[in-house]
């Protein structure tokens, strides 16, 4: 099969006007100005399927108002989760997966609180990197035998021992870190709302009042090319340097960041240091959509001087790099997976701009060589 578009956007290579993508089975076999008969998609930009590098499908039906305290919000989430049945979670996860597909996402890194439910889900073409969420209360036997990745929740809910076990597994790791001022206060200063909330629940607080959470994870051996740090909002210059030197990737969730009314994220500093930056939606508990295009538009609003190409890379090639799947995902190139989407050009002369500001429905979608 050959697909022609007004613009073919490999992302890993320059845009191709009136380009063609050749597909055999589930794999891209050629990209360029290819001769011969093609299926013409028309006035669209054809690009790789988007990669959502951080999501919680479990929370699809758990919108939780923010009450100006991150610790209180977490407590509200825990209380809301306790009211859900397995059937509620299954319905929510399936609904979230459908929302992601409808928005042109083909791969999702999903943090899964209930990995035992995964096998009960209806089949979906969506490629999900299931990462069981780990805290010290979860028993090892509850985990799938071969999870795609591991998601130790955060430094305030995961012990040094559990973090070290995750790091020693050699698997892909994703973890929340340096997300809030309250978390920063807890670890650097040994005080604050989150500190008191966890202390009263009996948490061992001996890891607090010494170093920040990023430095703590580094001391546990967690940071590195297998690690995707989620949020990383409250960073010192030393934290930025550690993330860069270890090759740790960072995922930013622009609309969730706005929901919590946080100070601007340190993305320019991370970018200048060479940290691999990705994009995610987080969950519908802190967002009103699982649409990666909406995340790109929000990022462009906050950083209007950023080139659209950089933003698209965060949702494609950069995310694939974080997953150690650069040759397979996030690009249109020979031997890559045939995951493609098309968005209307909509009057834009630059294909990257057309993608970042796309608001019309996806014009075409293919996963593993099958049109969706």
Task: Locate the predicted segments by residue.
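Alpha-helical scaffold segments that flank or form the walls of functional sites
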Residues: 22, 45, 61-124, 143
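His/Asp/Glu-enriched, well-ordered alpha-helical/loop segment
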Residues: 220-222, 265-345
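Histidine/acidic-residue-rich catalytic or RNA/ligand-binding cores of hydrolases
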Residues: 181-195, 240, 244, 261-270, ...
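N-terminal metal-binding scaffold of metallo-dependent hydrolase/deaminase domains
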Residues: 1-36, 325, 370
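Histidine-centered catalytic micro-motifs
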Residues: 49-60, 172-182
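C-terminal cap of metal-dependent C-N hydrolases
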Residues: 9, 337-372
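Active-site metal-binding motif and surrounding structural segment of the metallo-beta-lactamase
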Residues: 33-47
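Active-site gating loops and adjacent loop-to-helix segments of metal-dependent hydrolytic enzymes
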Residues: 60-91, 180-224, 299
């Amino acid at each position: 099969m050959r697909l022609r578009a007004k613009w073919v956007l490999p992302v890993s290579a320059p845009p191709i006007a009136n380009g063609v993508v050749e597909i055999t089975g589930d794999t891209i076999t050629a990209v360029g100005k290819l001769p011969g008969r093609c299926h013409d998609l028309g006035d669209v930009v054809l690009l790789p399927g988007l990669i959502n590098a951080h999501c919680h499908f479990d929370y699809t039906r758990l919108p939780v108002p923010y009450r100006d305290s991150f610790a209180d919000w977490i407590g509200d989430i825990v209380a809301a989760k306790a009211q859900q049945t397995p059937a509620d979670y299954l319905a929510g996860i399936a609904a979230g997966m459908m929302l992601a597909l409808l928005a042109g996402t083909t791969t999702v890194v999903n943090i899964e609180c209930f990995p035992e439910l995964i096998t009960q889900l209806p089949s979906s073409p969506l490629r999900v990197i299931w990462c069981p969420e780990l805290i010290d209360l979860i028993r090892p036997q509850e985990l799938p035998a071969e999870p795609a990745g591991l998601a130790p929740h955060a430094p305030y809910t995961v012990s040094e021992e559990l973090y070290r076990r995750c790091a020693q597994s050699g698997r892909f790791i994703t973890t929340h870190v340096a997300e809030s001022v309250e978390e920063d206060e807890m670890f650097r200063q040994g005080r604050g709302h989150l500190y008191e909330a966890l202390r009263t629940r009996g948490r061992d607080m001996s890891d607090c009042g010494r170093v920040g959470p990023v430095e703590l994870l580094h001391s546990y051996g967690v940071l590195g090319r297998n690690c995707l740090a989620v949020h990383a909002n409250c960073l010192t210059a030393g934290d930025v340097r550690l993330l860069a030197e270890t090759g740790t990737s960072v995922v930013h969730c622009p609309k969730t960041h706005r929901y919590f009314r946080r100070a601007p994220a340190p993305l320019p500093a991370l970018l200048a240091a060479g940290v691999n930056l990705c994009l995610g939606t987080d969950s519908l508990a802190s967002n009103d959509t699982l649409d990666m295009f909406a995340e790109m538009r929000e990022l462009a609003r906050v950083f209007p001087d950023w080139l659209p190409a950089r933003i698209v890379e965060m949702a494609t090639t950069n995310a694939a790099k974080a997953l150690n799947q650069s040759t397979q995902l996030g690009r249109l190139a020979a031997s890559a997976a045939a995951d493609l989407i098309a968005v209307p050009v909509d009057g834009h002369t630059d294909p990257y701009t057309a993608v970042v500001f796309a608001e019309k429905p996806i014009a075409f979608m293919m996963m593993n060589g099958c049109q969706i």
